[in-house]
Amino acid sequence: MTTMDILRRTKAAWPSICNASAEDKNRILSAMADSLQAECDAILRCNAEDMDAARGHISDVMLDRLYLDKDRIDAMADGIRATVALPDHTGRILAQIDHPNGMKIYKKQVPLGLVAIIYESRPNVTSDAAALTIKSGNVCMLRSGKEAFRTAKAIVAALKQGIASAGGDPDIVNIVEDTSHQSATEIMQAKGLVAVSYTHLRAHETSQD
């Protein structure tokens, strides 16, 4: 599928999570954490492939950020479980204005829609971003750096398994197959589909394909 196809598919899944109760969202998140640990071996195999391909092309600091082991995956799962423990502010009234004519105006905290996250080669961002997006009642579109793509794709596959096992729509989290600069541009310019885009890239990555 093209980047735009995946964006549309992700956006179409939004009603399933924006209307979900806090209990339903937390059940999905807990299942995501469990699935991440259950798929540890598959994720580590993909990470080893990414590490082999990246050696000699990125710095030792970046290699360390890319590297995963069981302890790091356990920490990622614990991060998702920590999100479960956070308060759910969806629907919270932030302010109220009462007019003399009886009309009441509320400032209310509501989900935004599709949150796109464009990031470099940090596998832990994949699970952190997905968890926080779902907790807030939004859907998540991820675009990983090319060095971490195999790892990120395996993590997303595990998260989607967890979502499905908890009765959620797996398309509330998706990853773009295209890691080129063009795909990042497409995402940032997808008006009407993307509510918010967050970009965290190394300086040189913004100008390379």
Question: Would you name each region that the model predicts?
Answer:
Residues 1-105:
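N-terminal Rossmann-like NAD(P)+-binding subdomain of aldehyde/semialdehyde dehydrogenases
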Residues 85, 89-161, 166:
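Conserved small-residue-rich beta-alpha loop and adjacent elements
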Residues 104, 175-191:
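A structured beta-alpha segment of the ubiquitous adenosine-cofactor-binding alpha/beta core
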Residues 132-133, 187, 207:
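Hydrophobic/aromatic ligand-binding patch that stacks against planar heteroaromatic rings
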Residues 169-175:
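A glycine-rich helix N-cap at a beta->alpha junction
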Residues 192-196:
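Short active-site oxyanion
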Residues 199-206:
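Conserved small/polar residues in nucleotide/adenosyl-binding loops
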